Amino acid sequence: MPQNVILPGPAPWGFRLSGGIDFNQPLIITRITPGSKAAAANLCPGDVILAIDGYGTESMTHADAQDRIKAAAHQLCLKIDRAETRLWSPQVTEDGKAHPFKINLESEPQDVNYFEHKHNIRPKPFIIPGRSSGCSTPSGIDGGSGRSTPSSVSTLSTICPGDLKVAAKMAPNIPLEMELPGVKIVHAQFNTPMQLYSDDNIMETLQGQVSTALGETPSMSEPTTASVPPQSDVYRMLHDNRNEPTQPRQSGSFRVLQELVNDGPDDRPAGTRSVRAPVTKIHGGAGGTQKMPLCDKCGSGIVGAVVKARDKYRHPECFVCADCNLNLKQKGYFFVEGELYCETHARARMRPPEGYDTVTLYPKA
């Protein structure tokens, strides 16, 4: 809704501007400084500026709008458009009149007959079948349906704790009120979802409360055990298993080994064979290809780098001349009478017959 706002001068005005035709956005107030002239004029962030001192802002750039605001010396007239904000409030019609929704946190009193089961929630006395001493018959209880009608309430003068279970089973949905010396016990048992609480446990608790109030020792009922007829197969099976001594369980493999050990060599059962533990073979007993090579000079095993010459193995440090101990790696070597020599000492040991010259022959590459 467009409206005119006048800010008295001089600057500063106390608001921040954004947008313009160069940003393809309208001129919008984005920030108001608290306590400024803009705040006193009730400007709000989000107000769209339609005109500045009578000049429309449809074709103004951001810089033009700032210049127009700076040019205002005595007062600044702005035409703004503020979107209406409507607060949603639910409407509740009652007797043809609309009024706002009423929220009341206080609990309202409800009628006694509000509940669906239509039972009288006020406690009623009960009657015990076969016992008429000290018990009064309520006028509003129907023994067949267990329902009660609103009528005068009468309380019991005397009560026996052992008769509570019988009375509660006859009318499980009727609350019980018991007047005891100095104590008033009200027991209201309602239906529980999915039989969450046991009726016997509830009655045991109630009987204990009444016995404690009367000064008697509560007699707890013994737990009922399921009796098994002695003639049944289940009873005989349980009785036999209880008397027979149990033997330790063994796996199938140990049982077979035990039978083989107990039986002699002649009376061995058919279809069985002797079982021996596997013997771990020594790794060195493998084929010749897996043997550790032995050095031809020092006689010890070679681990790692090895030098082979005429099917003989040597350590790299043992591959030397037999006379001068010169390492023959990357050099020529000669075998003379089973020994390894360099070229110089090999010539000295190989003297040709008279009339012959010594010629060194190298293997072809």
Curated annotation (Swiss-Prot):
Domain LIM zinc-binding: 293-352
Keywords, comma-separated and alphabetical: Cytoplasm, LIM domain, Metal-binding, Phosphoprotein, Zinc
Disulfide bridge positions per record: none
Biased composition (Polar residues): 147-156
Keyword Zinc-finger: no
Pfam families listed in its UniProt record: DUF4749, LIM, PDZ
Subcellular location: Cytoplasm, Myofibril, Sarcomere, Z line
GO biological process, alphabetically ordered: actin cytoskeleton organization; actin filament organization; heart development; muscle structure development
PROSITE patterns: LIM_DOMAIN_1, LIM_DOMAIN_2, PDZ
Record flagged with keyword Cytoplasm: yes
InterPro entries per record: PDLI1-4/Zasp-like_mid (IPR031847), PDZ (IPR001478), PDZ-LIM_domain (IPR050604), PDZ_sf (IPR036034), Zasp-like_motif (IPR006643), Znf_LIM (IPR001781)
Residues recorded as bearing Phosphoserine in the entry: S18
Chain segments carrying region Disordered: 126-156
Domain PDZ: 1-84
GO MF annotation: an example: actin binding
GO cellular component terms, semicolon-separated: adherens junction; cytosol; filamentous actin; stress fiber; Z disc
Function in brief: May play a role in the organization of actin filament arrays within muscle cells.
Self-association state and partner proteins as the record states: Interacts with ACTN2. Forms a heterodimer with PDLIM4 (via LIM domain).
Protein name: PDZ and LIM domain protein 3
Organism: Sus scrofa (Pig)
